[in-house]
Amino acid sequence: MINKDFEPIDPAVSPRFADIATFMRTRRHDISPQVDVGLVGVPFDLGVNYRTGARHGPSGVRDGSRVIRRVHPSSGIAPFEICNVADLGDAPINPMSKDISIAQIQKFFEQLVENEIAPIACGGDH
């Protein structure tokens, strides 16, 4: 059964092309123990030269994932029925300092661990 506080936005209520994009149209939540799986952006690309752009990954994935369905068409798995999935926003970064950014990103993910949230992250240098 879907927890109504974590239910993805219904496209019959708000079309997929409308409103602010979130990962897979999940609801935006703050870090809390209620969240089982946290979808997180890491808009960071200070570690590369001449190949910037990974910082735009999270917003691109959020926008592109508007069309993802609630049930996987092949496996039949409905993740929103078995756990609380939420968009937790982006890890904080400092666009002028790689070292400060890495420390901020690490602290953000430590908060996820403290709250027993399984992170799924996109964007950033790999």
For the regions a protein language model found, what residue spans apply to each?
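Metal-dependent C-N hydrolase catalytic cores
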Residues: 1-126
